[in-house]
Regions:
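Active-site-adjacent structural elements that line small-molecule/cofactor binding pockets in enzymes
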Residues: 1-156
Length: 156
């Protein structure tokens, strides 16, 4: 993938896929970061030496600061095991945010963060080692987006 992103022609023969003289056109104008969205030991071992960022879904860490901190510790350990300095990796968390009553179309085993509590939650996530947060709004609509944007504008 890195060779394709660097503008190289690539030939690959795999068990399930192959590519012959593949090239990515137009070529990227900058380095494209690669993010891993996995917490599994096998995939971490395979991918951590090659990625720029790691992301986890809210259900993987219980949508809590403590859960993220614990998982971040596991990821840092996996980085070391893979021969990677954890500080070189961007650490990212998806956060489930409920606006108002929400839509009800979300997992019942994970408590959402209320929009009004989001600024403090994001500060605490940063203290726990999150470099970025990807917000998953419930409901996902214009009103919710505006309300959340207004709630966190002072963090920018």
């Amino acid at each position: 993938m890195r060779l394709l992103l660097a503008g190289e022609h690539v030939t690959f023969e795999g068990e399930f896929h192959s590519a012959h003289d593949a090239v990515l056109l137009p070529p990227p104008h900058r380095t494209v970061p690669i993010m891993l969205g996995s917490n599994g030991a096998r995939m971490l071992g395979i991918a951590l030496p090659h990625v720029d960022a790691w992301n986890t879904w809210f259900s993987s860490y219980g949508n809590t600061v403590e859960g993220f901190a614990n998982l971040r510790g596991d990821i840092d350990g996996a980085c070391v095991k893979a021969g990677r300095d954890p500080a070189e990796l961007t650490h990212s968390a998806c956060v489930l945010v409920q606006v108002g009553e929400g839509s009800g179309a979300r997992p019942s085993d994970v408590s959402p963060v209320a929009a009004k509590d989001l600024p403090s939650h994001l500060r605490l996530l940063a203290e726990a080692g999150a470099d970025e947060a990807i917000l998953v709004l419930d409901p996902i609509d214009e009103r919710s987006t505006r309300q959340v944007a207004n709630a966190i504008v002072d963090l920018l």
